Amino acid sequence: MEAFFTPEPFSRLPTEIPIMSNIAAIFAGQGAQAVGMGKDLAADPDCAALFAKADDILGFKLSEICFEGPAEALTKTNICQPAIFVMSAACFTALRKLRPQTAFCCAAGLSLGEWTALWAAGAVSFEEAVRILEARGRFMQEACEAAPSGMVSILRVPVETAAEIAAATGCTVANYN
């Protein structure tokens, strides 16, 4: 738990941060990407350093894709997964700089966002997370290209109606929310 309050790169923060807090850090999953994301944050040297470090690790300019696009590249899983992680890490870095006194009781994320939560909690390094998410995204992209498929949301209808729609189109209802 203590690692969450002073994770790298935040070792410069005060060590006497109260453990009791009701503030959680929640991180977004895939689908949160948009061209231009992070461009304003990159004006901060610490946030810019995260984008530059990711560029070096990945061997391509992820920062340029985030800041300038094209949208087609940013929506590919092998690009958007590390991109969303780096953007979320930059947001958290900026928040910690603006409000260093803020104590978090926990970190959580939706799917891909779990990796940002692990980083924020000090469980994985930035470098490890970028490498893992590049591989995760690449494997998922390859799987999508090998077996073209898709998903659709059916909202505000009874489960029976959703099942009828799915059956009529050769699909299966897979998730219920």
Predicted segments, located by residue:
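Helix-rich "cap/lid" substructures immediately adjacent to catalytic or cofactor-binding pockets
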Residues: 21-108
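Glycine-rich nucleophile elbow surrounding the catalytic serine of serine-hydrolase chemistry
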Residues: 110-118
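Alpha/beta catalytic cores of group-transfer enzymes, especially the acyltransferase/condensing modules
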Residues: 30-32, 58, 120-177
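Short, Lys/Arg-enriched N-terminal segments with co-localized hydrophobic residues
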Residues: 8-19
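Alpha-helix C-terminal capping segments
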Residues: 94, 98, 118-123
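A broad detector of short, well-ordered amphipathic alpha-helices
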Residues: 52-53, 86-90, 114, 127, ...
